[in-house]
Amino acid sequence: MRSLVEVINENLIYEVREKVYSKDVSGVTEFCNDVLSGDNWKVNKDLSVDIDKTSGSGYDMSFVFPNNVTKIPDFIKFKGRDVSIALTTSGPYNKNIEEFNLNFDGTLSTVTVNNVPKLKEITINDVQIESIFIDKCAKLETIDLSGCEVTDSACARKNKSLKTYKAPDLGKKVNTYNIDNPGYTDELYIMDGVRYKRDEKGKLVKI
């Protein structure tokens, strides 16, 4: 005969309820307190969030999504100049985020997304990005950078579930471009500013 503990464990359902933020200054402030690791931000009356450059060597905007937050509310827009961003697995954080839809007004310097286990979609709106790196996100299916302009580097590698990739515009001085994933590999490849095309066998041919 099974014990009472075994019966309870069999029928116990663990549910993480998605946190809902109100569409007002207090809701956006609460989101930033929950999700941004630093304090270099300010919420405006129009619900936009100003991000200041930090004086240290770290990222200006590090996301640390708790388990009950899986995306950025669509009414939040971030603003800043030459802002660096990180979304990586960090301790107990970023384990359940599924969508990273970044609405940004200004310019981005470095964007790093690495090893986020449940992330399925990355969308960044029309913005200039110096360098972006998206690596080792096992469930990532879609990257949408259409409308963005990359000026130095764009790399997306070892994202084994990637199916859809919408490329950014590439500036004339792009130094590195490497979109190489099991499900999707871009035929264009740039190394040290030299452009190549991958032929039908994957061999690089200088353009």
Positions of predicted regions on the chain:
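Canonical leucine-rich repeat
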Residues: 63, 72, 85-86, 100, ...
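N-terminal capping/linker segments that flank leucine-rich repeat
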Residues: 1-106, 115-117, 169-207
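LRR/LRR-like solenoid scaffold signature
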Residues: 78-80, 92, 102, 113, ...
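Ankyrin-repeat and related helical/solenoid repeat scaffolds used for protein-protein interactions
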Residues: 133-173
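Canonical position 11/12 of the leucine-rich repeat
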Residues: 69, 82-84, 96-97, 106-108, ...
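Short hydrophobic transmembrane-like helices used for membrane targeting/insertion
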Residues: 5-8, 97, 122, 129, ...
